[in-house]
Each structure stands twice: as C-alpha cells, then as structure tokens.
Amino acid sequence: MVAVIIKGNEVAEKKRAQLKEEVVKLKEQGIVPGLAVILVGEDPASRSYIKGKQKGCEQVGIYSELIEFPDTITEERLLAEIDRLNEDDRINGILVQLPLPKHIEEKAIIERISPKKDVDGFHPINIGRMMTGQDTFLPCTPHGILELVKETNIDISGKHVVVIGRSNIVGKPVGQLFLNENATVTYCHSKTKNIKELSKLADILVVAVGRPKMVTADYIKEGAVVIDVGVNRLETGKLCGDVDFENVLDIAGYITPVPKGVGPMTITMLLHNTVESAKRAGFICK
C-alpha cells in the first residue's frame, strides 16, 4: 500500500478560490476586507513570510497594508500603533510578524490586539473560546491541519489523534481542535518516554517538533493519516519535514509532503479569518 499524498497546495488553492468569490460578494455590499501586517526589523525570513501573506491577499481581493518599524522601536510606540489599528474601520485583521526584538514583550503585543481583529488566533480570549468550543478565530496552522484531515473524508469522531509537539502555536491548539471534533487526543513531547509506542497507536498523527526526519515507519500504524508540520533545511539545502517521507510512504494511509503540505494552508486560513472578520464587522451572515 502506498499512501495517498494530501497536496496542501491544491487544497489551499481550492479554498482561496472560494474566498475570492466571497470577497467579490462582500465588495458588492461595500465591504472590503482589510489586513494590516506589522514588521519590526529586517529579518529576511519574516519578510519572506510577509510576502506570501501579501500575495495571498492580492489573490483573493483583500486590502493589505504593511507597516514597517526599525528594530529600535519602543514597546510603547508599537502598542500605540496597535491601538490605532484597533480603531481603524478599514482594517479587519491585525497581524504582528513574530519574532520581535528582545526588548519587546510578545505577550503584551498579542494581548493588545482587539480579539475582534486577532486573525492569527493568538489572543487569550480567542484561545479560551477555542478551548470551550465557541465560534472564534482559530489559530491558522492548526486550523489548516484540521482542514487537510477533513479532505480525506475520514470521520474524525472517535479516532485516536497523537500530537508530537506541545508548542502554543501548533501542538497544544491542534490537539484541542481535534478534541472539539470528538477525537481522543494524546500529546507527546520531549519528556514523553514512549513516544514511538504511543505514536503507533495513532489513527491520525500530527508531528510538529522541528527535528528532520525524526518519525520513521516504525512510529506509524498501518493506514494512519500522517500530518507533517515540520520545515527543516538539510545541509544540501533541500527542505524536509519531521517525518521521513519516503520511509513512511508505504505504511501510512495518507501523508502530507514538505514542502507543499501544511505550509500553504497556514496563509489560507489567515485569509479565511480576515474575511470572517470583515463579515462580522459588516454583520454579514455566513
């Protein structure tokens, strides 16, 4: 058996086409979704990520605004800019590109963004709503992962999901999203002693640890859905995930590649959240 490859780039394109249609309808009602992105400093990786977000906005018709500051900006000045954007009716989503300089407290910045414009889904209020199963902005990468699994048409309810990784951005929230879908969820992390044995029990395995090709065939239950969130660059310059793709291909039922797997879905769900925010601001029902 050879696994079915879940092509995240194709799923993302399909969802962006749907978003584009929604944006056209919103514009007919005088509503233009707007996203503001704040970049502090000149980190090349951050600038690259932002270009992807700007391209996505352009693709679906979202107005985007890039606000740049030097890495010497004070926390007080950055907070003031967020306050301004919170009050700007043209802006439905505010995103501060992380990481920030060490003298700025990321927690304070994230919590200053209005929960109504927190399209990254990082604000504690939105995290709390997600935990309790309420309608809210879901964190983009976990939401993208859930959508990719749904593309397999597998009934998530009752399945055993194992998440390797416990970051606040991916690991913790993705487990909660699967729990909200009535899955049984097990978390594994650096202190878990029997990761291999636990992961082999997974109907759905999500790996997000940042260790190249850590997960091999002996971690995988036959026919499992394997979602690889890791993006690692080898000495050869080639990108690879946390899963040894070729090694796992013959035992998994479904698997995401790296690249063109989870990555394209992250930006797509950011666009989705921005459009949803515009609908809420304009009181447009789904």
UniProtKB/Swiss-Prot annotation:
Its assembly, as annotated, is:
Homodimer.
Q: Which InterPro entries match?
A: Aminoacid_DH-like_N_sf (IPR046346), NAD(P)-bd_dom_sf (IPR036291), THF_DH/CycHdrlase (IPR000672), THF_DH/CycHdrlase_cat_dom (IPR020630), THF_DH/CycHdrlase_CS (IPR020867), THF_DH/CycHdrlase_NAD-bd_dom (IPR020631)
Q: What's any one GO cellular component for it?
A: cytosol
* One Pfam family it belongs to: THF_DHG_CYH
Q: Does the keyword Amino-acid biosynthesis apply?
A: yes
Q: Which keywords are on file for this protein? A: Amino-acid biosynthesis, Histidine biosynthesis, Hydrolase, Methionine biosynthesis, Multifunctional enzyme, NADP, One-carbon metabolism, Oxidoreductase, Purine biosynthesis
| Protein function | Catalyzes the oxidation of 5,10-methylenetetrahydrofolate to 5,10-methenyltetrahydrofolate and then the hydrolysis of 5,10-methenyltetrahydrofolate to 10-formyltetrahydrofolate.
Which BP terms does GO give this entry? L-histidine biosynthetic process; methionine biosynthetic process; purine nucleotide biosynthetic process; tetrahydrofolate interconversion
Q: Which Gene3D superfamilies match?
A: Leucine Dehydrogenase, chain A, domain 1 (3.40.50.10860), NAD(P)-binding Rossmann-like Domain (3.40.50.720)
Q: What is this protein called?
A: Bifunctional protein FolD
